[in-house]
Amino acid sequence: MASNKILGIDLGTTNSAFAVMEGGDPEIIVNSEGERTTPSVVAFTDDGERLVGKPAKNQAVQNPEDTIQSIKRHMGEDDYTVEVGDDEYTPEQISAMILQKIKRDAEEYLGDDIEKAVITVPAYFNDRQRQATKDAGEIAGFEVERIVNEPTAAAMAYGLDDESDQTVLVYDLGGGTFDVSILDLGGGVYEVVATNGDNDLGGDDWDEAIIDYLADSFEEEHGIDLREDRQALQRLHEAAEEAKIELSSRKETNINLPFIAATDEGPLNLEESISRAKFESLTSDLVERTVGPTEQALDDAGYSKGDIDEVILVGGSTRMPMVQEKVEELTGQEPKKNVNPDEAVGLGAAIQGGVLSGDVDDIVLLDVTPLSLGIEVKGGLFERLIDKNTTIPTEASKVFTTAADNQTSVNIRVFQGEREIAEENELLGAFQLTGIPPAPAGTPQIEVTFNIDENGIVNVEAEDQGSGNKEDITIEGGVGLSDEEIEEMQEEAEKHAEEDEKRRERIEARNEAESTLQRAETLLDENEDAVDDDLRADIEASMDDLREVVEDEDADTDELTEATEALAEALQEIGKQMYQQQAGEGGAGAGAGAAGGMGGAGPGGMGGAGPGGMGGAGPGGMGGAGPGAGAGQQGDGEEFVDADFEDVDDEDDEDE
């Protein structure tokens, strides 16, 4: 019989925990080995047996080649596989093996089948990593009801005072990832205000520091690099992890690994003492790497450390005294320690499961997307549709247009990140919209819609509003951000902000110049008899000047803008002449379409093709006369999307 309970799972890098609501409270489930946490380790033995959890970890020294650990660090990587004999496994498949054990152990504990689960992920996981986690759950046989950010789940587990409003900082340092989140709490509402992190920082890195210290010392003394022997390296791993744990409660630890290597003269032993002070000096750079994300999260939330009411530590790595001291230094207060940091996330996941099943009815969780989402537009710019730290679920739409005449298809490229240039962010996916009726550049209206669900998973749709054709894409598991890319994304965005902005301004100026040239050609062709010879000569001279600047690859923003404005001023005279003609004829609509949608233009004025505001209405509302005026027709609506994607200025809609 299937239980209606929803299992809460903390799928960790080094250890996992799982819990369920019992009698109104979350309860950690003891696994089949009688323990409250399960090592996230999978092994394959010579006789084909598959081991998961503690049995896999216990035999790692004897079987290092076929023992897989810390697979979470590779979730969402398209090309990453684990080779075991003649077989290959993806990170999702290995994670599913861990989840299958969790499912079996939970069912044995509860005496019922468990079909549904809430699984947690680091707050800074990108879309591909979230999708990969969801896939792993489904491979394991779960209906994944929700993907929840780990710091948010932890905040729910701490049982903070529901009656008073408070701001909480969650510092989550696990085995392989680091997250920090700022939440506003009150009345049972858990609202994430900002989040940041480093997906390539965790307790494993502290272990590696000890391993390198021991291996370097041994190599210096004996001339043998233990890291080249898989079995010796696995013994070093286990010794380093044990030393790290001991140094959280002791000032010194001894490491003794007999027969770790051998020479012609006989076996060699490794004996070393490490003090806490030495350990902290070896790893000081690691704890410092948590400072930047913490300060950035506070800045994004608009808070100072004095605004924080409570600080919560999550993850086994926060037991290290050096970490606790750093957190207190960053926040100015002592963190709460009333919940086991290894269990907090799993307990919180169970609470969220209780919310979804109806067992808990006084909690509302409002999470956020950690990175901005958008598409590539003309000139290679990144056009954001959803900003980072936006509460999810959410949906956002923008209308774009084509940049070439008679374009019948467009390529929509979806990116995630904080850089102004699309290629410098992470490409999540791409798809084509075809069947667009041939039309002048700037005429088609293509609406692009981004939707992020409660799990943080992205769906993008593009629809040609003229033909009704539409295509969409759900970003599936695949090659996601590398650990290093995610770690550096915010830092790079800040470092290159000024450079990116200058590039954006220059690209926009060039786009505006090209659009104004296109508009000028259209106006002259469509109004050949209405433009006198002197004005035509002036406009053509300005067009020649602007073409020369556009063709100059070294032309800067000011040169492009100056030449564009000169042509725009000349184009204004067409509008004046036509207005005078219309006034004289008593027919105000005679040439409005050609003049650029003057006074009553459709959305976007003349559908200006310049990014950052299609419509390009010139001074006085003369649609189409100013820089950015585009090729759309008066009253036909906004201008829309293409492989070059040009943005629409919705403000012009108000002119109708």
Swiss-Prot record:
Listed Acidic residues bias regions: 523-532, 636-656
Biased segments, Gly residues type: 584-635
Coiled-coil segments on the chain, per record: none
Cross-referenced Pfam families: HSP70 (PF00012)
PROSITE patterns for the chain: HSP70_1, HSP70_2, HSP70_3
Gene Ontology MF, one: ATP-dependent protein folding chaperone
Biased composition regions of type Basic and acidic residues, renumbered to the chain: 492-513
Domain of life: Archaea
Region (Disordered): 488-532, 579-656
InterPro entries on file: ATPase_NBD (IPR043129), Chaperone_DnaK (IPR012725), Heat_shock_70_CS (IPR018181), HSP70_C_sf (IPR029048), HSP70_peptide-bd_sf (IPR029047), Hsp_70_fam (IPR013126)
Similarity annotation: Belongs to the heat shock protein 70 family.
Described function: Acts as a chaperone.
Protein's name according to its UniProt entry: Chaperone protein DnaK
Species: Natronomonas pharaonis (strain ATCC 35678 / DSM 2160 / CIP 103997 / JCM 8858 / NBRC 14720 / NCIMB 2260 / Gabara) (Halobacterium pharaonis)
